[in-house]
C-alpha cells in the first residue's frame, strides 16, 4: 500500500531559486488552501528554499482554483505523503532533518495527533522553528472558522454582501511570513528553534483597525468626508482621487479651477467642494484625467466601470 509518492505531473515546476535575504533558509510546509501557500510563496520570493508535502489527494486549491495554486507554488518543490501512515511520517521526518522552518495550518489537537505538537517537535529537532497558522489564538484555535467568519468578527463585512477579497487569509499569510523571519532572527541570537502562532482572526482585526478608528466611516477623512479623497464619476467611467495631503489637494484645486475664499482656506469637508469636484470630473474623460494626473503629479486612477 503506497503511502508516499511523487506529485502529479500537473504540479508546478520549480522556477530558478531567487536570491534574497532568506537565501539558504529551508522552509517545509504541510499547510493547505490559501494562507500557508501564500506565506510560503512570500518566503520563496525572499530567497528561501521552499518545499511542501501534500496529502495524496492534493491541496484542495489545486482542484477548485488551479491558476491560484500554480501562482502560489512557483519555485516550490511539491511532493505528497499520507502523514497518518508510518511511511508518510518517515517521509516527513526525513525532510525535517534538513528544515529550518516548518509551516503548519492544522488545529493544535490535529498537530498533536500527527506527533507535530511543539513540545515533541522541539525535543526531536532543537534547531527547528515552527510557524503554526491557526484560526484564532489560544484555546479558540480549536473552534471551526474560516476567512469569512474572522472577517465578520473583525467588522469587515457589510449587510449580505460578500467581501471583495480574502483579507483574513492574505493578512494571515503576510503575518506568517513575517513570523518566519522573526523566528530565524531569534534562532540566530539564541541558537534554539522557536514556535510562533499566527491567528487569522488576529490578522483580520489588524487589517480592520482603520475602520475601528473611524478613518473609513463616512465622516472619516479617508471614508469620503474629504472631497479630495473619493471616487467620482467621469464621462466614460470612474476616477479614484487621493489628493489628501495639502500639496496634492492644492494641485487638485488648481486644475479644477477651485479658488479659496478671500479670507481663509478651502474647506475640503464642505459639501460645496464635493459638488465642484463632481462637476469637474463629470466633464472629463478617463484619458483626459490620466493626462492631467501625469502632468500635475496627482494621485489619481481612472476606472472603466
Residue ranges and their predicted role:
Residues 160-167, 188-204, 218-226, 264-266:
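Conserved Rossmann-fold dehydrogenase catalytic segment
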Residues 182-193, 203, 257, 282:
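Generic secondary-structure signature for well-ordered alpha-helical cores
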Residues 57, 135-138, 200-206, 236, ...:
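Glycine-rich beta-alpha junction loops
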Residues 29-30, 104, 198, 241-243:
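Active-site-adjacent beta-strand anchor residues
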Residues 190, 208-211:
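Non-catalytic terminal extensions of PLP-dependent enzymes
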Residues 227-304:
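Aromatic-enriched alpha-helical interface/lid elements that frame and gate functional surfaces
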Residues 213-220, 256:
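Short, surface-exposed loop/helix-turn segments at secondary-structure junctions
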Residues 1-192, 216, 276, 287-288:
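N-terminal helix-loop segment corresponding to the beta1-alpha1 unit
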Amino acid at each position: 500500500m503506497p503511502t508516499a509518492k511523487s506529485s502529479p505531473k500537473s504540479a508546478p515546476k520549480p522556477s530558478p531559486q531567487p536570491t534574497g535575504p532568506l537565501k539558504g533558509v529551508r522552509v517545509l510546509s504541510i499547510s493547505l488552501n490559501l494562507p500557508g501557500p501564500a506565506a510560503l510563496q512570500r518566503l520563496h520570493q525572499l530567497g528561501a528554499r521552499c518545499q511542501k508535502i501534500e496529502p495524496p489527494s492534493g491541496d484542495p486549491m489545486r482542484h477548485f482554483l488551479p491558476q491560484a495554486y500554480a501562482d502560489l507554488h512557483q519555485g516550490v518543490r511539491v511532493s505528497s505523503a499520507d502523514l497518518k501512515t508510518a511511511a508518510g511520517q518517515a517521509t516527513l521526518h526525513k525532510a525535517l532533518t534538513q528544515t529550518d522552518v516548518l509551516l503548519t495550518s492544522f488545529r493544535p489537537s490535529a498537530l498533536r495527533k500527527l506527533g507535530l505538537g511543539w513540545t515533541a517537535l522541539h525535543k526531536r529537532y532543537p534547531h527547528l522553528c515552527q510557524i503554526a497558522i491557526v484560526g484564532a489564538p489560544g484555546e479558540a484555535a480549536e473552534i471551526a472558522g474560516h476567512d469569512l467568519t474572522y472577517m465578520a468578527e473583525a467588522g469587515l463585512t457589510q449587510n449580505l454582501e460578500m467581501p471583495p477579497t480574502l483579507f483574513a487569509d492574505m493578512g494571515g499569510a503576510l503575518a506568517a511570513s513575517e513570523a518566519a523571519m522573526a523566528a530565524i532572527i531569534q534562532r540566530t541570537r539564541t541558537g534554539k528553534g522557536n514556535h510562533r502562532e499566527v491567528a487569522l482572526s488576529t490578522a483580520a482585526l489588524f487589517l480592520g483597525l482603520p475602520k475601528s478608528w473611524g478613518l473609513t466611516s463616512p465622516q472619516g477623512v479617508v471614508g469620503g468626508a474629504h472631497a479630495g479623497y473619493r471616487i467620482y464619476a467621469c464621462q466614460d467611467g470612474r476616477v479614484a482621487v487621493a489628493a489628501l495631503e495639502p500639496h496634492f489637494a492644492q494641485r487638485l484645486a488648481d486644475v479644477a479651477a477651485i479658488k479659496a475664499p478671500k479670507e481663509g482656506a478651502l474647506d475640503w469637508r464642505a459639501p460645496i467642494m464635493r459638488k465642484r469636484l463632481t462637476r469637474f470630473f463629470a466633464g472629463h474623460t478617463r484619458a483626459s484625467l490620466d493626462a492631467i494626473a501625469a502632468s500635475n503629479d496627482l494621485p489619481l486612477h481612472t476606472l472603466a466601470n
